[in-house]
């Protein structure tokens, strides 16, 4: 069973790996990825950086392409303010991805 954690407007879904997950149908995985298209996500990388951008595509090596991406460096003692660096289109190598969080879908609040 997958566990879901909501934090700061982002959702993290962790799926434990089992023998059954290796046999998961390609259609289910494809539909899951299609549901994430054009959604904002935060990707944490092995070097401590995080990228926030719009999910555009992935490949069989788990590389991810983000559009309108911004890079946030790991906060250090000398620089407490985390100002983003605008990257635009960014490719994140799959082997550098630690976690992916998808922004919650919220409907606009009209008064």
UniProtKB/Swiss-Prot annotation:
Q: Recorded GO terms, molecular function?
A: RNA binding
Q: In the UniProt record, does the keyword Protein transport occur?
A: no
Which UniProt keyword terms apply here? Cytoplasm
Subcellular location(s) per record: Cytoplasm
An individual GO BP term:
negative regulation of apoptotic process
What is a single Pfam family found in this protein's UniProt entry?
A: LSM
Recorded superkingdom:
Eukaryota
Per the record, what is one GO cellular component?
Answer: NatC complex
Domain Sm intervals: 28-106
Quaternary state and interactors? Component of the N-terminal acetyltransferase C (NatC) complex, which is composed of naa35, naa38 and naa30.
| Function, as annotated | Auxillary component of the N-terminal acetyltransferase C (NatC) complex which catalyzes acetylation of N-terminal methionine residues.
Family statement: Belongs to the snRNP Sm proteins family.
Protein known as: N-alpha-acetyltransferase 38-B, NatC auxiliary subunit
Per the UniProt record, the lineage of the source organism begins with: Eukaryota, Metazoa, Chordata, Craniata, Vertebrata
């Amino acid at each position: 069973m997958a566990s879901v954690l909501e934090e700061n407007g982002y959702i993290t879904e962790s799926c434990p790996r089992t023998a059954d997950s290796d046999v998961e149908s390609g259609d289910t995985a494809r539909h899951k990825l299609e549901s994430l298209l054009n959604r904002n996500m935060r990707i944490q990388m092995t070097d401590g950086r995080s990228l926030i951008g719009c999910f555009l595509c992935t490949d069989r090596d788990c590389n991810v392409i983000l559009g309108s991406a911004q890079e946030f460096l790991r906060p250090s003692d000398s620089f407490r303010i985390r100002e983003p660096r605008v990257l635009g289109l960014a490719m994140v190598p799959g082997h550098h991805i630690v976690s992916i969080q998808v922004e919650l879908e919220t409907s606009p609040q009209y008064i």
